[in-house]
Amino acid sequence: MTIDIYIMMGLPGSGKTTYCETHAKNKENIVEYLGQPLNLELKEEIYIDGLILTNKTLMRLIYEEIEPLKDYFSLEDINIKLHIVYFKENRKQCLVNDEYRMLQGKRTMNAEYSIKMMKFEYPDLSLFEDYDVELIKKDIYNCHLT
């Protein structure tokens, strides 16, 4: 069995949640990562949506949450394929998108400070040589304020 795990990596307002909602086969396959244990279930596809901005956070997610899947389900022949969905850095558009989702009532707290100030790194795939890893580069989603 192959498990395709899609990990969103991008600034607030880049389109991570929109990507998950438009690509996952069903919403039960989308898991929100807040830096706490995920308790992942065995599914053919998993979309991990969260604020993953650095290689350190990405490594912690993979080695603390995904790696245990191999041990936990050791009775089955499991192949884990990682898809890191990287939203290119465009802080200006992220600010527009954040304002848009605030106006639409999709968020109750704006992310302006995080968008402007947080460190954002390009994923270093050499850190995950034990995995079959694909990097998917995406332009950020564009909301238009009217």
Task: Please tell me what each predicted stretch does.
Residues 1-3:
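Phosphate-binding P-loop
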Residues 5-7:
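Short hydrophobic/aromatic beta-strand immediately N-terminal to the Walker A/P-loop
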Residues 9, 89-146:
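Conserved GTP-binding G-domain of TRAFAC-class P-loop NTPases and closely related GTPase folds
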Residues 9, 18-65:
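Conserved substrate/cofactor phosphate-moiety recognition/catalytic segment
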Residues 14:
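ATP-binding Walker
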Residues 27-32, 47, 82-84, 130-142:
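Conserved beta-strand scaffold positions in the cores of enzyme catalytic domains, especially
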Residues 33, 37-39, 68, 74, ...:
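Acidic/proline-rich low-complexity IDRs
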Residues 51-107:
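ATP-dependent NMP and nucleoside kinases share a basic, alpha-helical "lid"
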